[in-house]
Amino acid sequence: MQGSIDSHIEGIVQNILEDSVGTKGEGVYLVAMTVKGSAVHRKIEVILDADSGVRIDQCSFFARRIRERLEEDEALSGTMGEDFDLVVGSPGLGEPLVLRRQYGRHVGRLLRVWYRDTEGVEHEVAGHLQAVSLTEGGGSITLKPQTAKKKGRQEETEDMTLELDAVSRAVPEAEI
């Protein structure tokens, strides 16, 4: 039953996002959604993003729309309970990138990436994201790896290109 509730709520969220064309919510997409708790008290977390980033006013815009639809939905009335928490936000710094589409807005930023080489050995690299190439079946990213500074100057490194299929995790990091 929980799985069908999750997919029903996700369908509602997707419909709201699709209906937002031409409004302040245009261009926003669903990254992740979780539903926790029992029928007595549920917590719904919705993580949204956009190619240019999501603003706070967009999160509140969608929170209102989602809450209205959930409260009006007769299919959920018996299974949701009257008391539920709804949290709508955007991915924070340090949160892993979940969708390929998210890489584009991090060009120029520091990224820590875990990837597997051709032998299947996992490696970790931190560097500035230089480019993103998304294709129908995959894509790649180009990083300029960070190196340790030696006596006041930073050593030059060559850019490295990684196929997105080889990337197991990528996390934007703060620059210090």
UniProtKB/Swiss-Prot annotation:
Keywords: Cytoplasm, Ribosome biogenesis. It is found in: Cytoplasm. GO terms for cellular component: cytosol. Residues 143-176 are annotated as: Disordered. GO terms for biological process: ribosomal small subunit assembly; translation. It holds the Pfam family RimP_N. The keyword Nucleus does not apply. The keyword Cell division does not apply. Required for maturation of 30S ribosomal subunits. Belongs to the RimP family. This is Ribosome maturation factor RimP. It comes from Chlorobium luteolum (strain DSM 273 / BCRC 81028 / 2530).
